[in-house]
A protein has these predicted regions:
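Active-site glycine-rich loop that binds ribose-phosphate moieties when present
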Residues: 126-145, 172
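Internal active-site segments that recognize and position negatively charged phosphoryl groups
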Residues: 137-166
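A glycine-rich beta-to-alpha transition motif near the start of alpha/beta enzyme domains, typified by
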Residues: 2-117, 156-277
Length: 277
């Protein structure tokens, strides 16, 4: 006779960081031994699950406050997620295993975070791979995009009227373009609003759709805009569909460090789901 899988009750909190929503699971005491990729595919859909851009699992770590893992709605595990990391920091304080200032481990490196009243700020890993002015052919047209990795890869396209951006169609074409194979890239559409403010819409790899916000995309867009002289210095204020973010950083030539992503986090609801283990 084959083994029978047992049902496990998983407690979760749904949180949102500027419109990016996540299913948060506290696993620092190793309560759950689950296939988190399958969990994300099962519960991220809105109509048949909880509804979220991804699942964030916080595991125990001996060197930092915890380990951060994020699984996209398609089940793929991402290296990092800016707004997800901000939610994780807030969630860790709520759950009582981190203080208002903390460090945690991600696949992209160690992240610092602090809780400042209504805002959660995370110190990102230093961006890499800055490459402005990449020419690619999309839909039989030549366009110039700019690339940077802010924990995950991002391509940036500046446009004059962001309301008219074909985020899904063009974003998907850029995301899967051979130039960025095999890992692919996120695609950001950016309109400059003033010398310290931009508006960003993002097609997210793994979600495979436009999201209300993308923290690493906001950081990537702000740094590229500053690098090209489209905004002046830091901080850069970023408008997204889900709300406003602030990006701070230090520049030394073409190197950027001390990068902070700052914005609000909301707890939406808590609940439990039954999962076969």
């Amino acid at each position: 006779m084959g083994s029978t899988k047992r049902m496990v009750k998983v407690s979760f909190t749904k949180m949102a960081g500027t419109g990016n929503d996540f299913i948060m699971v506290n696993n620092v005491k190793k309560l759950y031994n689950l296939d988190w990729q399958a969990f994300a595919v099962r519960f991220c859909p809105l109509k048949t699950g909880i509804g979220a851009d991804g699942v964030i699992v916080l595991d125990e770590d001996t060197d930092t406050d915890f380990t951060f893992r994020i699984f996209n709605a398609d089940g793929s595990e991402a290296e990092m997620c800016g707004n997800g990391a901000r939610c994780a920091a807030f969630f860790a304080v709520q759950q009582g295993f981190a203080k208002n200032s903390m460090r945690f481990k991600t696949l992209a490196g160690i992240i610092g975070a602090r809780i400042d009243k209504e805002d959660v700020a995370i110190q990102m890993t230093d961006p890499e791979g800055l490459e402005p002015g990449i020419s690619i052919d999309v839909e039989d047209k030549r366009m110039s995009v700019h690339f940077i990795n802010t924990g995950v890869p991002h391509a940036i396209l500046f446009i004059d009227h962001i309301e008219d951006a074909r985020v899904f169609e063009l974003g998907r074409a850029i995301r899967f373009h051979n130039r960025f194979a095999p890992a692919g890239t996120n695609a950001n559409f950016v309109q400059v609003l003033s010398q310290d403010r931009i508006h960003v819409r993002t097609y997210e790899r793994g979600v495979e759709a436009e999201t209300y916000a993308c923290g690493t995309g906001a950081v990537a867009s702000a740094i590229i805009a500053e690098h090209l002289g489209k905004v002046i210095g830091a901080p850069v204020h970023v408008r997204t569909k889900g709300g406003d973010l602030k990006i701070d950083f230090t520049r030394d030539g073409s190197r950027y460090s001390g990068v902070w992503l700052i914005g609000p986090v909301d707890t939406v609801f808590t609940g439990e789901v039954m999962v076969r283990s």
